[in-house]
Amino acid sequence: MTPADLSQLIKQTAIDVLSARELDTTVLPETVVVERPRNPEHGDYATNVALQIAKKVGMNPRELGQVLADSLAANTAIDEASIAGPGFINIRLAAAAQGEIVAKILEAGATFGHSDLYQGRRVNLEFVSANPTGPIHLGGTRWAAVGDSLGRVLEASGAQVTREYYFNDHGRQIDRFTNSLVASAKGEPTPEDGYGGDYIKEIADAVVAQHPDVLALAEADLNERFRATGVEMMFAHIKESLHEFGTDFDVYFHENSLFESGAVDKAIQTLKDNGNLYFNEGAWWLKSSEYGDDKDRVVIKSDGDAAYIAGDIAYVADKFDRGHDLCIYMLGADHHGYISRLRAAAAAMGYEPSNVEVLIGQMVNLVRDGKAVRMSKRAGTVITLDDLVEAIGIDGARYSMIRSSVDSSLDIDLQLWEQQSSDNPVYYVQYGHARLCSIARKAADLGITAIDPDLSLLTHDREGDLIRTLGEFPAVVKAAAELREPHRIARFAEDLAGTFHRFYDSCQILPKVGESAEPIHTARLALANATRQVLANALRLVGVSAPERM
């Protein structure tokens, strides 16, 4: 019996109790909250449903709680139900009912933890979207890991997810990038507002190698050749780095296409037609303050050029017009103002603003020996995705980025993540999976299988702890999807690995040399197999490998 199953049982029991007394059953919450008590001596689970509804039905909380506890205790799945404090109900499951969790995991396999929470939803998930003017930096690396993991979690929750990279190839930053390449090719100093680093020289040299006569072209043609070829080469490197990192995209959307296709002009005309654009002081303004923004925004400047928000307006419209009903933007710490701005843009275009979500990620720093690591040899100024992978590997880089909430700034201690010890979180979790695989191999060598185990034998405290932890996984995935917080999966994996290691230290899973296999060994092997499955499922959701040997 999973916590979700127990929640349903408690609710149905409450409905029966209230109905028998001709009391209002509509006061019950949609989902009865079931939690594990801090003190395991109090039981396996606890609920406060009696406290929630007692006053609404005119009963004393303890009196109602006792009636509910007595009714629950009559169920064969419940070993004990008792009242504590002002009306909490503590519940201890029967061993057979608790063991059902193991059977459910083994039956569901790789889909355990999945749900239909967002079945039928089409989600556009835009993340990374770094300018094609340099390698992916640490902020982009965080989004590459977290965004990919969030996509996996949403898909596990039934959503159809489009992973999208917005390719900023329209604007002043491309001019600066081009000027930097040209200066490098000519052997001139980097422009004052240009980009430095070895990668600029590498790309400039590659452009010259591909087009030997490029430096003899007229200035306009020379700049265009370096712009087009340089951006193409830089973006190819970005794609390659992301692919090796385990992050791929379904759509690479070019900002420039919004202008070339007429999408920006079309969006502006729509806003004029629906009255959400007005002319003032030589410019066209969006009535964004009417839709929750802190002020109106200039869309067409007095010189006739489109402001940056013009592309944002056309882009959000394009996302909805492609059939997405939820658009999630994952942006850097300097984009807080975009939350109200993008929602206002959607509303002004006639779309539901609540279907636009903006997640803001905080800064990432690398630390070694207690000091910040700031320089990248290749990039010149910032640490890159490639630098991090080279230092701690792909799994370490992904996991280090995912395991903390993006709401908080992140310091990555390179010494910690380089260790092959239990102090390293990803090593700790992966070692748990590898140890479980080793157990499965040894069981196979001994001819022991987990077919038709008697799971009611799993009564040891460590067995119960492990089973209850496994049972939490579906709720963890659900919360990670609803709250857009994939770090919950990583933290759960660490908790599960720790609970397993404690079980392993306390319970003999396989018979000792010279002993015959007993039913308890079969039951514990089934529990170990279920744990291996859930650890693998969790690691898959964060995009980290589940090694069979370490």
Curated annotation (Swiss-Prot):
Localisation per UniProt entry: Cytoplasm
Any Pfam family: DALR_1
Domain of life: Bacteria
Major subcellular location class: cytoplasm
GO biological process, one term: arginyl-tRNA aminoacylation
GO cellular component: cytoplasm
InterPro entries membership: aa-tRNA-synth_I_CS (IPR001412), Arg-tRNA-ligase (IPR001278), Arg-tRNA-synth_N (IPR005148), Arg-tRNA-synth_N_sf (IPR036695), ArgRS_core (IPR035684), DALR_anticod-bd (IPR008909), Rossmann-like_a/b/a_fold (IPR014729), tRNAsynth_Ia_anticodon-bd (IPR009080)
Reactions catalysed: tRNA(Arg) + L-arginine + ATP = L-arginyl-tRNA(Arg) + AMP + diphosphate
Coiled coil: none
Gene Ontology molecular function terms on file: arginine-tRNA ligase activity; ATP binding
Keywords of the record: Aminoacyl-tRNA synthetase, ATP-binding, Cytoplasm, Ligase, Nucleotide-binding, Protein biosynthesis
Short sequence motif 'HIGH' region: positions: 130-140
E.C. no: 6.1.1.19
CDD domains per record: Anticodon_Ia_Arg (cd07956), ArgRS_core (cd00671)
NCBIfam families (UniProt xref): argS (TIGR00456)
Family classification: Belongs to the class-I aminoacyl-tRNA synthetase family.
Quaternary state and interactors: Monomer.
Designated name of the protein: Arginine--tRNA ligase
Organism of provenance: Corynebacterium diphtheriae (strain ATCC 700971 / NCTC 13129 / Biotype gravis)
Gene name, Swiss-Prot/TrEMBL: argS
